[in-house]
Every structure is written in C-alpha cells, then in structure tokens.
Design a protein with these regions (language model features):
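Acidic, surface-exposed loops and disordered segments
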Residues: 1-163
Length: 163
C-alpha cells in the first residue's frame, strides 16, 4: 500500500511541458532477488564493489519502487543537454528535461515515503540493474528506491564490500 502511494506521488509529480514520460513499478519478492543477482553480475563486469554492497542491501527491502523516463526530446532547443538544438542532440544523449522530470518524480516519491515514516534510499545502481533487466520497458534512465519499515534504516551505515 505505501509503495503504491509513492508510485502515485511519482506519477502525479510536475512534468516539464506537462508531458508524462515517467514510468513506475513496484518490485517485490523474486524480482528483488533478480535485481540483486544482476547487481552481482554488474560488479563482475565493472569491478565496482559497491554493486556487491547494494546487491546485499536491497535484499533487506520489503519492496522497491523503480521509476524511469522514456527518452523524448521536448523540442525546447534550450541547450541544457549541451547541444544548441534538439535536432543536433545525438539520440544517445538524454534530453535534460527528461532527467529533471525523473528527479522530481523520485523526490516526490521519497517525500511520500518520509511522510509515512518509511526507510528508503535512492539507488542508481539498483535502477541500472532494473533497466538492464527491462523492468520498465524501454526507459533509458531508471532509479530504484528500496523501502523498509524497521527500527533502523538498513540502507544507511552500509559496509563496503572488499571481495
């Protein structure tokens, strides 16, 4: 129920130009294990040990909200992406407005979790794993918010993996 409220907050968050390109979903049970396994694979591929730490850490979540953005040029020619016009921006470079929209949606979801006194942490690592697993279709930038209701937030004061 609480994660659904977070998803609603992300869904209804303000969007640039009023265009909704945000996708949200809830990850539970076996899919959390799949995310964890993907993080282990990612650590092996990159050598980044914090992926291992996060692989263990998300197993303590009761659920994980994932949010991502479909890439869609907004046609503002604002140059915020680093290119003078939307036409000149390579397809592989995200529209800055898309990223801002995702940040606002994630912030809104976290504010809702805080209002409900839930423990969370925004994780790009678990978001990347969800993206690699296609959990949000063709979204190109995905963030994950593991959620727990416990006496101490399990997503902080984490130990770095050394092996």
């Amino acid at each position: 129920q609480a994660v659904r409220q977070m998803m609603t907050a992300a869904r209804t968050a303000p969007k640039g130009k009023g265009i909704d390109i945000i996708e949200v979903a809830m990850v539970t049970d076996e899919d959390i294990k799949r995310l964890s396994e993907e993080l282990v694979i990612m650590s092996g591929e990159t050598g980044l040990k914090f992926f291992l730490r996060d692989a263990d850490n998300i197993l303590q979540a009761e659920a994980i909200m994932i949010a991502g953005t479909r890439q869609q040029v907004q046609g503002l020619n604002c140059a915020h992406c680093g290119f003078p016009t939307c036409v000149e921006k390579p397809k592989t470079v995200p529209c800055a407005i898309n990223s801002v929209d995702l940040g606002i949606a994630v912030g809104s979801a976290c504010a809702t979790a805080s209002d409900l006194r839930l423990d969370t942490r925004v994780m790009f690592s678990a978001g990347m794993a969800a993206q690699r697993l296609g959990m949000l279709g063709d979204c190109k930038c995905v963030m994950a918010i593991p959620v727990s209701a416990s006496s101490k937030n399990p997503f902080f004061d984490r130990k770095t993996k050394t092996e």
